[in-house]
Each structure stands twice: as C-alpha cells, then as structure tokens.
C-alpha cells in the first residue's frame, strides 16, 4: 500500500427516490460485483417491508437504526515497547457512519430469512428497537474500549 497519497474523498450523489446521501451509501454497501440496480431493488423492497411491518416512515426507522448502531469508541492496536496494546480511541464522524452501514449489511447477510430484502428489513427494524446483530457488535466494541480504558493514555 502506497503511503504517499491518500485516495480522494468522492462526493456521493443523493438517492433519487429518498433524496438521501445515507441511502446511497447503504446501496453501495449492499452492492456486490458492481450490480447497483440489484442493490437498489433490494433496499427499496426492504424499505417497503419496513413500512408494512412498522406502519412508520421507513426513513425514520432507518435513521433510528443508524443512530443506535453508530459506535462512539473503538480499539486500535498500538505497538509500544514490543507489546501490542488495544488503545481505545474516539471514532471519526465519517468512520462512525461507515461502520454503522457496514455492520447493518453484514449482520443482515448473516440472518436466516430467505431473501436479502427481508433480512435487511428485519435487521433495520431490530436495530431501531435496539436489538439484533449490529447492535450487539456495537456493544461488544464499546465493551472492548471500556475494558482497555487503562491504555487510553497511549492515544495518538
């Protein structure tokens, strides 16, 4: 990996249906092998299922899910004096959003429902209700950070 230049941050266009950049980022997280239209179909279908099951606006449920899944702290490995320490650090705003979306999709894929749109809809609903795999991942991440609080002075 080259250390000279970091990749430029590209602007993401807002989703045409929900007019949200966050929805576009979720579509991009769902997308496999460049099949964006398939990812869009999955997400829109999942949002329709969310609307049917909760009788609420799917964007509100999705926003609540993202807010609940977003991590505040994480541990980063730092080598000091031949020993590796797990140092708790605050998560930057962009990484918070990225991790939340990644975890939602990751734990939706691990669910046992038949199709991805049902899995994603149920994971979004669970996350908005503070249950589910993505919430557990966030809690585990926070527990790790809390357990390694003694090494917080190694922050950089």
UniProtKB/Swiss-Prot annotation:
User: What residue ranges are annotated as transmembrane?
Assistant: none
- What keywords does the record list, in alphabetical order? Ribonucleoprotein, Ribosomal protein, RNA-binding, rRNA-binding, tRNA-binding
Provide GO CC annotations from the record. Answer: small ribosomal subunit
Q: Name one GO molecular function term.
A: tRNA binding
Domain of life of the native organism: Bacteria
InterPro entries assigned to the protein according to its UniProt record, in alphabetical order: Ribosomal_uS7, Ribosomal_uS7_bac/org-type, Ribosomal_uS7_CS, Ribosomal_uS7_dom, Ribosomal_uS7_dom_sf
UniProt keyword tRNA-binding present: yes
Q: Is-annotated flag, keyword rRNA-binding? A: yes
A Pfam match: Ribosomal_S7
GO biological process: what's one of them? translation
Looking up PANTHER family in the UniProt record yields: RIBOSOMAL PROTEIN S7
Q: Which family does it belong to?
A: Belongs to the universal ribosomal protein uS7 family.
Q: How does it associate, per the subunit comment?
A: Part of the 30S ribosomal subunit. Contacts proteins S9 and S11.
Instruction: Quote the function comment for this protein.
Output: One of the primary rRNA binding proteins, it binds directly to 16S rRNA where it nucleates assembly of the head domain of the 30S subunit. Is located at the subunit interface close to the decoding center, probably blocks exit of the E-site tRNA.
- Protein's name according to its UniProt entry: Small ribosomal subunit protein uS7
Q: Which gene encodes it?
A: rpsG
């Amino acid at each position: 990996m080259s250390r000279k230049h970091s990749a430029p941050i590209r602007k993401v266009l807002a989703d045409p249906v929900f007019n949200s950049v966050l929805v576009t980022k979720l579509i991009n997280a769902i997308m496999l092998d460049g099949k964006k239209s398939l990812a869009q179909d999955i997400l829109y279908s999942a949002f329709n299922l969310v609307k049917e099951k909760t009788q609420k606006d799917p964007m509100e449920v999705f926003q609540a899910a993202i807010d609940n899944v977003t991590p505040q702290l994480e541990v980063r490995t730092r080598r000091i004096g031949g020993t590796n320490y797990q140092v708790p650090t605050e998560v930057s705003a962009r990484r918070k959003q990225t991790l939340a979306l990644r975890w939602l999709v990751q734990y939706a894929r691990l669910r046992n429902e038949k199709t991805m749109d049902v899995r994603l809809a149920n994971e979004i609903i669970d996350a908005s209700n503070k249950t589910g795999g993505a919430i557990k991942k966030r809690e585990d991440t926070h527990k790790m950070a809390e357990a390694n609080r003694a090494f917080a002075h190694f922050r950089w």
